[in-house]
């Protein structure tokens, strides 16, 4: 579970950066 957190944050960060 803890391993998924950074991955989810990275995905959200990528979307925010693209926006």
From Swiss-Prot:
GO terms of biological process kind: defense response
Tissues expressed in: Expressed by the skin glands.
Sites of Glycine amide modification: 19
Q: Which UniProt keywords apply?
A: Amidation, Amphibian defense peptide, Antimicrobial, Secreted
Which cell locations does it reside in? Answer: Secreted
Family stated for the protein in its record = Belongs to the frog skin active peptide (FSAP) family. Phylloseptin subfamily.
Role noted for this protein: Has antimicrobial activity.
The protein's name in its UniProt record: Phyllospetin-H3
**Top-down, what is the taxonomic lineage of the species of origin?**
Eukaryota, Metazoa, Chordata, Craniata, Vertebrata
